[in-house]
Regions:
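Conserved glycine-rich cofactor-binding loop
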Residues: 21-22
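C-terminal helical subdomain
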Residues: 191, 207-242
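Active-site loop immediately N-terminal to the catalytic Tyr-X3-Lys motif
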Residues: 109, 158-162, 203
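Substrate-binding pocket helix/loop in short-chain dehydrogenase/reductase
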Residues: 107-120
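Residue(s) in the substrate-gating loop at a strand-loop-helix junction
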Residues: 151
């Protein structure tokens, strides 16, 4: 049973992707553009966004560019709201996807509050800012889709993840509540929980990353999930299903299993 309206026709739709200069965000924007969507790409790195636009030319029937760079810093209050107003002046937003994120390995023995708060600002509070920017528009239209990229790191506590993991767990809880409250309003909500994807963030890992996939592969998994109307889109399943299974264990078994599974 589909939990969301199936998103399988992107022709003429406008999708705003925040955190689209690299990785999953950029690959998803590229894949959506190929399917006929008008993509608005946002991130801090303006040159990377401009480069994306250069290799994704095209005009809509109304003469609007099919790829637009809208640089911003998600950690600045009001930045996403101002950007949303800029987009809405030219039309509507059909889907908003929050891909922005930061990640730094950190153990509890190396607790660093500034690092913790930076993760909160970018990974979680930025998502709240995006929702604040687009949700009133979606409620008026009685349509739209909110997509949040979390991680399997949000399923349960993992070593070296004290800054990153809690922000991803918060996104999972947030997405569940959004779905419960917005489904009756015909607003879709999807939660994306990747395993290891070869991105600039994961390149800093000094441990083996099982079932590592490319950003392009991740984008295709996301598109398939949207087309099926899934709420949670997790991949690659040969890895994520194991993580889900371990999380079902009682804590007396979970903690040793995680230590053995991660080797950390």
């Amino acid at each position: 049973m589909s939990l969301n309206p199936k998103q399988d026709n992107w022709q003429g739709k406008t999708v705003w992707l925040i955190g689209a200069s690299t990785g999953i965000g950029r690959s998803t924007a590229s894949a959506l553009h190929a399917l006929g969507a008008r993509v608005i790409v946002s991130a801090r790195h303006a040159k990377a966004l401009d480069d994306f636009v250069l290799v994704h030319p095209g005009k809509t029937a109304n003469g609007l560019p099919t790829a637009v760079a809208l640089p911003l810093d998600v950690s600045l209050d009001g930045a996403l709201q101002a950007a949303a107003q800029t987009i809405l002046k030219a039309g509507s937003i059909d889907c908003a996807m929050y891909c922005a994120g930061t990640y730094k390995e950190q153990r509890a023995t190396e607790f660093n509050l500034p690092t913790m708060l930076e993760h909160q600002r970018i990974n979680y509070l930025g998502a709240l800012q995006m929702i604040d920017a687009v949700l009133p528009h979606f409620l008026v239209r009685q349509s739209g889709h909110i997509s949040l990229i979390s991680s399997v790191a949000g399923y349960g506590g993992l070593p070296k993840s004290i800054a990153y993991g809690p922000t991803k767990a918060a996104l999972i809880n947030l997405a569940e509540i959004l779905y419960l409250d917005l489904h009756s309003k015909n607003i879709g909500v999807s939660l994306i929980c990747p395993g290891f994807v070869d991105t600039p963030l994961t390149s800093q890992n000094k441990f083996n990353m099982p079932a590592l996939i490319t950003p392009d592969e991740a984008a295709q998994e996301i598109l398939k999930g949207w087309a099926k109307g899934e709420f949670e889109i997790h991949f690659p399943k040969r890895f994520t299903l194991w993580v889900k299974a371990i999380k079902m264990l009682p804590y007396r078994l979970y903690f040793p299993a995680i230590k053995k599974f991660t080797g950390l």
